[in-house]
Amino acid sequence: MPTSLIDNKESSNFLVGLAYKANDIWYDLVEILMQLPGGELIINYIKASHKNDPWRTLLEALLALFAIKYFLASRYSQDDKDNMVLSKKETDELIEDWVPEPVVVDLREDEKWQIETNPILNGAVSKRVDIQQGDSISTNVLNFASLDFLGMSTDKKVVENSVECIREVGVGACGPPNFYGTQSVHVRCREDLAMFLGAEDCIMYGQDFATPISVLPCFLKRGDIVIVDGGAYVGLQKAAMISRCNIEWFNHNDLDDLESILENLSKDLEQGPLNRRFIVTEGLSENFGDSPDLKRLVEIKNKYKFRLILDESNSIGTLGDNGRGLPEVYNIPRSEIEITIGSMARSFGSSGGFCAGDKDMIYHQILTSNAYVFSAALPPYCAVAVSTIIKAIIDEEVEGKVNPHIRPLKENSAYLHSLFNNSKELSKYVTVKSDSYSPSLHLRIDADLREALDLPDVYGGPGSAVTKALKNGNEELFFDQYYNLESFKLQTIINKCVEAKVLPTRTKRILHHEVLPIVPELILHINATHTKQDLDYAYSVVSKAIIDTLEHWRKTGN
């Protein structure tokens, strides 16, 4: 039946009335909104937005409705019918049957010696220490296992200032540097470090191992490239890996190999997208005890437009007339090294790490460095200890002369190296890998003897069994019997030395954490407080222990 004219008019009047009613409601809402703080700003925004793009107004209205529904709705949608209700007996049975995964894999029987032979020091770290290994206690032992190269951690002034700081502000910083962890002594220490190193600014970290792992990812990401020394210690290896950039490795301190890699990359880098490019190396190698030619290294990085990250953990306080590291040796300004990182737990006799360089580079880390943002700041007394040691070194500076705090270490390092290098009998068993200026004397089993003992040249590295285990996720269960055996023999040498009141040390590395090939080493860390008589005695004890142990091994194969 056709609709009448009267029905059409009634429908039209109803719709018109509805429209007027909606209009009145809208204006009432607008008036209410105008009375609210910021309401006029919202209304003007809606008018301008609707005028330029009506569809945008509709989209924003829908988003607003969705947001209201989202926040008012229940956070979780649950159906009680799907919940399983267990009786107490069933719950107890499940708990009893549950076997948790171990936090760490249990040690094998032939690995437990590593735990049992860890020396425990009774008292402060100094030239002579009392140590406990297992059930045995040795007193007044000559310490060649400490990285406190200058021997200043027990200096009277350092101890007094540290104690005074503890009494004033307590032991811990109680928070990250970015929040409430930074105190005045931290600021002074940063200034002292920057001034000592000749850098614009400096930043400090609570842990030295966390320093490279936090600094490198601040400046490297996917698509960037870093070329790392092939002898870098594990901290630099991990730092490069977690930054997720492209990594190239050049042969240890082989600058010809470095330049060859850069030359091969140069064409691709010119054509590819603009990215960040760094070279990473150490001022004094932790694994080899030698240094690169910094002058040529700077020339290479400038030629190929790369930046340089130099880890001076071992070279600060040991190299240069005043202990300012490798740049002081080559008379190169610190500004030529874009990023300098290092440890304060070695020559500075304290704890933590630092990064020095350009102010903008330092400021960038304040907001982007994981360790700086999330980890606790360095304990205040540790910062005071570093500042005190720096002041002591600077106060003794005389231009053109070796600093009195540095000279004994240099002389001791050269002397002990000469004793080991000049021994023809000892050279049949071990090879000195470190250079004479290194305060850490590195000894490796001689290549010919390794072959006679059926030991591999190196352990780990690309293509090795441990690398394959790592790819398969079985690295925790991997065991290298030769690596364990060689490390045990070095520990046997150490045990014999401890019986004679000398404490050397050895490399203690976890094989599956190392990306690069490694070789176990016996190490003597030389101290500025050691006397010539100490060094002579240590040489006689260590050399006898080496010859006795390795000769017995060679003859018996056991």
Protein language model regions, located:
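Conserved PLP-anchoring active-site segment centered on the Schiff-base-forming lysine
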Residues: 216-234, 255, 259, 409
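PLP-dependent enzyme catalytic core of the Aspartate aminotransferase-like
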Residues: 3, 48-56, 60, 64, ...
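Substrate-binding/gating loop at the entrance of the active-site cleft, primarily
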Residues: 207, 228-245
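Conserved PLP-binding catalytic core of the aspartate aminotransferase-like
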Residues: 401-417, 425-501, 513-533, 539
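Conserved N-terminal alpha-helix of the aminotransferase class I/II PLP-enzyme fold
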Residues: 71, 159-207, 415
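Active-site C-terminal subdomain of aminotransferase-like
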Residues: 304-307, 314, 319-449
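N-terminal "arm"/small-domain region of PLP-dependent enzymes with the aminotransferase-like
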Residues: 2-10, 14-20, 24-172, 306, ...
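Active-site phosphate-binding strand-loop segment of PLP-dependent enzymes
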Residues: 148, 248, 253-309
